[in-house]
Amino acid sequence: MTNEMKIGKLVLRAALALGLITINVELSAGNAGENQSSVREIVAADRIKASGLDAVYDFDAVSPAARPKGYKPFYISHYGRHGSRYAYARETYTDLLEMLQKAEQEDNITEYGKSLSLRLADFYEKVRYRVGDLTDKGWNQQKRMAGKMHSDYPRAFGKGSNVRACASGSIRSIMSMTSFCTELSRIAPKTEIIAHQGLEYIQATSPNLGTNPFRFKGPKFDFPYAESDEEFLRSFFPEYVDVLGRMFKDPSKAIEGKSHLWTMDYMYMLVGGMNSLDDDVRNDFSDIFTSEEYVKMWEVDNYLRFCEYYWYRTSCSAIFVDMLDKAEKVIASGGSGADLRFGHDHCLMTLLMIADLDHFGHFPETPEELSQYYQTYRSPMAGNLQFIFYRSRRKGAEPLVRVLLNGQDAALGDLAHSESIYYAWSDLRDYLRSRIAMFL
């Protein structure tokens, strides 16, 4: 059953079938394809970027609003990640804590490990019932995003405009949509805003889910690298044992029977996840890794996510199909407004591969070189991909489209711009159709 929220001038009526919502009412990556040392220098110089998927949206690193001469913005097609959240996996908060507590019982813990265990236990009491929830920071990110979209492109939200929003079934995505639409309804009272959540919209929000009955099927692909993510940890960052050695007298005993990769990645997400938490909850666990170790762990996690998201290119093509179809209808109708989709990093990252955005879909010879092109920090909390459509008064003139990733201009592979930073709509449409066809 489809769930809807219809937003009037300043009224939000929520009727979500899940029955779980009561409303009480912070990346720029440089250019993809940079040389290896350049990417690693960027990450080493910026602890937020080194947090990968736990980076937060940087509102200060966006390109100024612009428009081609003789054109006016009339429509925005958007796919956005939910705002900042608590860890999506409980193990982020419990895995290391349980290891430390067990080690203390077995006299296998260092003094540093004892101190860390106490800090973690205290922190866990604050977050144990909040796993996966949107934080206040995440709510405010989406609110601010709505304000910026309206201030940059006010003509898209004038009288007679329509905004259609949909979200995945995740509560953090639904709450992100709610925050965005609530603010937009306040500042754009002439715009009709309809928000949806339901299985009918899964192809536009989270089509890679195994529960998706409409999931696209496509050709089988070979993975480009022989090395598994677990093997990559051991070959690329063998010093991870030093991290464990500061906590445990015998690290091999402490980690026996566990995935070394996930043990380290839960620690990495614990540290980076502090970026998203509110001040009264946040704790500082940055001492778990040295700066050099944290950068290494970014690259390990970067490869881990690639190993997962590579396989979503077929299913996530549904999002681009939805974007193209809805844009065609708006253009044909002469209407204005926006289509907003609220989902997850695994979809946003996959869209970048499908479109080869800034050559994100280029896979070099070895996994050690992958970070030249593929960087998780390009999908921060509240990260988003936007197509901004511009219409000319000249009869027969084709719409132009500006492509923005996290508020910065981005390039679609080697597709030529028709004017400055803008693509002709037919060129962009045909390019994306050709890319989608590769995976279907």
Model regions and ranges:
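Bacterial Sec-dependent N-terminal signal peptides
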Residues: 1-34
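Signature for phosphate-centric chemistry
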Residues: 30-164, 168-339, 343-440
